Amino acid sequence: VKNFDVVTFGSAIADIFGTTDQPITNNSFNYKIGHKLLIKNLQFDIGGGATNAATAFSRFGFKTGCVCKIGDDNNGKDILALLKKEKISFLGSIGKGKTGVSIILNKKKVGRTVLTNREESDNLKSSEVKPFKTKWLYLSSLLGESFIAQKKIALKMAKQGTKIAFNPSEYLIKSKDIREILKVTSVLILNEEEARLLAKKYKKKGPLLHSIRSLGPKIIVITNSNYPIRAYNGIREYSIKPHKIKVIERTGAGDAFASGFVAGIMANYQIEKCLKLALKEGESVLKYFGAKNKLLKKNIRQ
């Protein structure tokens, strides 16, 4: 059985980026049914929470594994090639179906719309996961069979002393009961919307950081677009202001921030230093297309 510093468990997706000049009305892309939509700057990349975070951890010098399910197709081969290039062990499985795909439609200075087809990403059974041991298990969002497998493995490993980092998405919080995972979570990272949703779902009142910590996580980090990022460890609150930067594309920035923070904790940094590292990592991704091509390369493993 292989030993790791950290194993990421989540989706592996082929990302297709396109930019449009389509007008925006009422916060929506304005296009008629039946019309063609012209896009520019078409780019292909590998995405998904598991591969994004794994790349970040590996570049920070940690021995990294990745649990995800891909299809038996060219996109799946590209994902395996990326993991190999980034020195990440593939601990998941290859299904008979297709690899998941996201189409990311960008409008300069406005934002993006993402169309996602998750395919094999959500079809992973726990029996298909290769056995491993790890100090940290980083969970990003999965649905279907894969969520059941992820939860089962996370709860089992937490009992054996593995630390859990959790970065749940809005759709996961809405659609699944995640309380059991939260109870064993060492680090929980989410954005303001996700945090509000979580507090509301489990009827937690009072200041967000405190109310969510009562669900079990030892350290909570809440990001909030251009507003200060806040963290709480049950003793004191910390905050850091994002820098004013030119945002080119947001895909993968959340994964980069979250894995940057967890990498800092793994390197025994103080929380303030973890926030600085996370911010630097997240902002390195915001300035370019693609979720991981500009992730930092810096060995911080102790």
Q: Could you say what each language-model-derived stretch is?
A:
Residues 103:
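C-terminal catalytic lobe of FAD-dependent flavoproteins
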Residues 54-63, 106-107, 264-268:
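Alpha-helix C-terminal capping segments
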Residues 64-90:
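A glycine-rich beta-to-alpha transition motif near the start of alpha/beta enzyme domains, typified by
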Residues 1-65, 77:
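Glycine-rich phosphate/adenosyl-contacting loop at the front of the ribokinase-like
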Residues 1-6, 16-20, 173-174, 205-302:
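Conserved phosphate-binding/catalytic region of the ribokinase-like
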Residues 30-41, 79-84, 236-246:
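Glycine/charged-rich beta-loop-alpha catalytic/anionic-binding loops adjacent to active sites
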Residues 2-20, 80-94, 107-239:
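Ribokinase/PfkB-type carbohydrate-kinase core domain
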Residues 57, 191, 254:
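Short, conserved phosphate/pyrophosphate- and ester-handling motifs at nucleotide-, phospho-/glycolipid
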